[in-house]
Curated annotation (Swiss-Prot):
InterPro entries: Cupin_1, RmlC-like_jellyroll, RmlC_Cupin_sf, Seed_Storage-Functional. Residues 66-238 form the Cupin type-1 domain. Residues 147-157 have a biased composition (Acidic residues). It comes from Pisum sativum (Garden pea). Belongs to the 7S seed storage protein family. GO terms for cellular component: aleurone grain; vacuole. Seed storage protein. The lineage of its organism: Eukaryota, Viridiplantae, Streptophyta, Embryophyta, Tracheophyta. This is Provicilin. It comes from the Eukaryota. Keywords: Seed storage protein, Storage protein, Vacuole.
Length: 275
């Protein structure tokens, strides 16, 4: 009858359900057994090769941090060290068009006068104390504010533009200062001084030193130009340059007679005043 048929169908359904549940349990047990597997050394090496060849490698390498002091300093002697990474050396800096540098100046030492041809450098004092001196046009922050009423006023302003002025400031940890392009600057350390700099417009920038035995742009000037440019003769300028045996960093401690120091100081001011 119908009741007997329903009973048989129900039993068959229960058997089928029980069979499926058994198969599922067996698969689950098999998967659990294979959670921890033993991998050979050769398999590990193959996996490592595949990981290194991933397309993500180029992306991650561009975002990796770098250490400024991991390479040799560009300028170095017993008085200081200068480290720098430029866009040519690090692709991370190419799109930003900046360079990053780090300067260590020993106590009582001087980072010799120099200027950047294109770059504007933002410098922060990490550690130590000292002072810096920057040479720029007199009243250049007020240029363009005065109206040109007559020819005499125009001539006076033109003469002012051709004059230079020295700007000085003390340096302490946490201070930030800006070095405009084309402005000579020198830094003296009253204690061990560490500076971190960021240069904007880094592409094709050149750092030109105005003092020191090496990379001194003044020593490359022809004799006839020196005679016309600097007070005194070209021989006096050459004699001053020859007396500077250090390059990039020098000892700022007075070790010579006061008259001799004053003579060098006056000549240095004359040279800076010509720019």
């Amino acid at each position: 009858d119908n009741a007997e048929i329903e009973k048989i169908l129900l039993e068959e359904h229960e058997k089928e359900t029980h069979h499926r549940r058994g198969l599922r349990d067996k698969r689950q047990q098999s998967q659990e057994k294979n959670v921890i597997v033993k991998v050979s050394k050769k398999q590990i090496e193959e996996l490592s090769k595949n990981a290194k060849s991933s397309s993500k490698k180029s992306v991650s390498s561009r975002s990796e941090p770098f250490n400024l002091k991991s390479s040799d300093p560009i300028y170095s002697n017993q008085y200081g060290k200068f480290f720098e990474i430029t866009p040519k050396k690090n692709p991370q800096l190419q799109d930003l068009d900046i360079f990053v540098n780090y300067v260590e100046i020993k106590e009582g030492s001087l980072w010799l006068p120099h200027y950047n041809s294109r770059a504007i450098v933002i410098v922060t004092v990490n550690e130590g104390k000292g002072d810096f001196e920057l040479v720029g046009q007199r009243n250049e922050n007020q240029q363009g504010l005065r109206e040109e009423d007559d020819e005499e006023e125009e001539q006076r302003e033109e003469e002012t533009k051709n004059q230079v002025q020295s700007y000085k400031a003390k340096l302490t940890p946490g201070d930030v200062f800006v070095i405009p392009a084309g402005h000579p600057v020198a830094v003296r350390a009253s204690s061990n001084l560490n500076l971190l700099g960021f240069g904007i417009n880094a592409e094709n920038n050149q750092r030109n030193f105005l003092a020191g035995e090496e990379d001194n742009v003044i020593s490359q000037i022809q004799k006839q130009v020196k005679d016309l440019t600097f007070p005194g003769s070209a021989q006096e300028v050459d004699r001053l340059l020859e007396n500077q045996k250090q390059s990039y960093f020098a000892n700022a401690q007075p070790q010579q007679r006061e008259t001799r120091s004053q003579e060098i100081k006056e000549h240095l001011y004359s040279i800076l005043g010509a720019f």
